[in-house]
């Protein structure tokens, strides 16, 4: 009976850890949503109002279809772009504090998935 419990508990714990990790990487908690929105307003909104593009003709939007077309519809790609920039957009690694790039990227992906409602 002890072996059965052991064989049952280990996979359950493993699944919980995997689920928590993927959930944390993809979705934000309430405080992070506020932080993500604040960071976006301070750093990105001047160029990407509601996920659109208002700077230069031909600039890219943050709408999900545009992110997918460019192969950057994931948190890690957005983190890299937020830090290093892309095209005409400069990077903000000197402006973003530790962890803010991830919170911002998660917030952008969540809003892109919701259609920037």
Residue locations for each model-derived region?
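C-terminal capping alpha-helices of c-type cytochrome domains
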Residues: 93-117
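Generic hydrophobic secondary-structure packing signal
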Residues: 26, 32, 78-81, 101
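Short hydrophobic/aromatic-rich motifs at helix boundaries and adjacent loops
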Residues: 16-17, 48-52, 73-76
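Electron-transfer interface patches adjacent to heme c in soluble/periplasmic c-type cytochromes
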Residues: 63-76, 91-102
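Periplasmic/extracellular electron-transfer cofactor-ligation site
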Residues: 31-62, 80, 84-90, 110-117
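Solvent-exposed, well-ordered amphipathic alpha-helical segments
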Residues: 23, 37, 83, 97-99
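N-terminal export/targeting leaders of redox proteins
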Residues: 1-34, 114-117
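Phosphate-binding glycine-rich loops and adjacent basic patches that engage nucleotide phosphates
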Residues: 2-8, 38-47, 64-72
């Amino acid at each position: 009976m002890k072996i059965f419990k052991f064989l049952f508990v280990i996979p359950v714990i493993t699944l919980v850890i995997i689920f928590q990790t993927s959930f944390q990487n993809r979705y934000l908690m309430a405080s992070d949503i506020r932080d993500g929105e604040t960071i976006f307003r301070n750093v990105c909104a001047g160029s990407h109002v509601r996920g659109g593009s208002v700077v230069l003709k031909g600039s890219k939007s943050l709408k999900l279809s545009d992110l997918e077309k460019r192969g950057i519809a994931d948190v890690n790609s957005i983190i890299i772009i937020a830090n290093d920039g892309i095209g005409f957009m400069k990077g903000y690694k000197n402006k973003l504090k530790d962890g803010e790039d991830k919170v911002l990227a998660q917030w952008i992906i969540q809003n892109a998935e919701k259609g920037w409602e």
